[in-house]
Regions:
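Short, charge-enriched, intrinsically disordered boundary segments that mark the beginning
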Residues: 1-8
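Terminal helix-turn-helix DNA-binding modules in bacterial transcription factors
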Residues: 8-25, 44-80, 107-126
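Conserved hydrophobic/aromatic pocket- or pore-lining residues that grip, position, or stack substrates
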Residues: 14, 38, 253
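Sequence-specific DNA-binding recognition helix
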Residues: 22-42, 68-104
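A solvent-exposed interaction/effector surface
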Residues: 60, 64-67, 83-301
């Protein structure tokens, strides 16, 4: 089964069972892939998580049912998988901007979220440089924040996180003695989001005395043991602000490289390596920034 057919079959399965309790393992099975691979590919490809798609489709349908004037709020809430009218009302208002009761009024403005259909568009014909590398296990020390699953908020979340944790960053930079390279780690993916870390490799002397040197401040950090494994490594173009290119590159990997590669995404941390050399007044250096994406992969069975 090709990947487009597989994803469409999974979407069709969701739509056929939209008013029932959905099992994500069953959904992934329709695409002949693992739950982790399917959900990661789905979110990168579509720009939202599978859970967000299901929730938006159910709330869109709920608005239509209530606008007809015949459905009871409690019945619609149960069909959408909510345990109580209160939790349904909160979700409905967040999606539509009005309460379920207001949706039953004449001329109520509602939001629609259409069914997803995968279409084949002839793209590509472009070069993509990549390498497959067996990475050794490594230890990173970093600080994290839980990011929501909504990618529309990710840019703001990332920006706020970076601005609000400058002290944590400068401490690790000083201990690592690395000033032009920062690691990012994404792990613990779920319907609600994922853990996002800024991290650095620290020398042994810094790790040995970490708690003693930092005291209570050390509690702000986590030591991350990244397991050895196979990674697909791709790089953005060199420019002043390469972080803006990361999402587009990740989508290209999923749509252009992964489907015909014979590999799948495996359940391991996704690593980013931000190369940020700086030399005051030197445009050549300052326009040579780039980001490496390390996607954990394994051979498809």
């Amino acid at each position: 089964m090709d990947w487009i057919t597989g994803i469409q079959r999974a979407i069709d399965y969701v739509e056929e069972h939209l008013n029932e309790e959905l099992d994500y393992d069953d959904i992934a099975r329709q695409s002949a892939s693992s739950p982790f691979h399917f959900q990661r590919v789905f979110s990168i490809l579509c720009g939202y998580t599978l859970a967000e798609y299901v929730r938006s489709r159910r709330l869109s349908a709920a608005g239509l049912k209530l606008a007809s004037g015949n459905a009871k709020v409690i019945d619609v809430a149960m069909e959408c998988g909510y345990d109580s009218p209160d939790s349904f009302s909160k979700a409905f208002r967040a999606f539509h901007g009005i309460t379920p009761s207001q949706a039953r009024g004449n001329g109520a403005m509602l939001r629609s979220f259409s069914r997803l259909n995968i279409k084949v568009t002839l793209e590509g014909g472009n070069e993509m440089q990549y390498r497959l590398e067996e990475k050794p296990a490594m230890l990173l020390t970093g600080y994290k924040r839980r990011f929501s699953g909504n990618p529309l908020d990710k840019g703001e979340q990332d920006h706020n996180f970076a601005c609000e944790t400058r002290v944590e960053q400068y401490v690790l930079e000083g201990m690592s003695r690395i000033h032009d390279t920062t690691y990012t780690v994404m792990t613990n993916f779920s319907d609600s989001g994922y853990d996002f870390y800024y991290a650095y490799p620290l020398p042994k002397w810094a790790l040995d005395d970490f708690e003693d040197d930092l005291g209570d401040f050390a509690k702000r950090y986590t030591h991350l043991q990244i397991p050895a494994g196979l990674y697909l490594v791709c790089e953005t173009e060199r420019c002043m602000f390469p972080t803006a290119l990361v999402d587009a590159l990740r989508r290209r990997i999923v749509t252009e490289w992964l489907p015909t590669s014979g590999y799948v995404l495996r359940n391991a941390p996704e690593i980013g390596v931000i190369h940020w050399p700086f030399e005051d007044g030197n445009d050549a250096v300052n326009n040579s920034h780039y980001v490496e994406i390390w996607l954990p992969v394994s051979k498809a069975e």
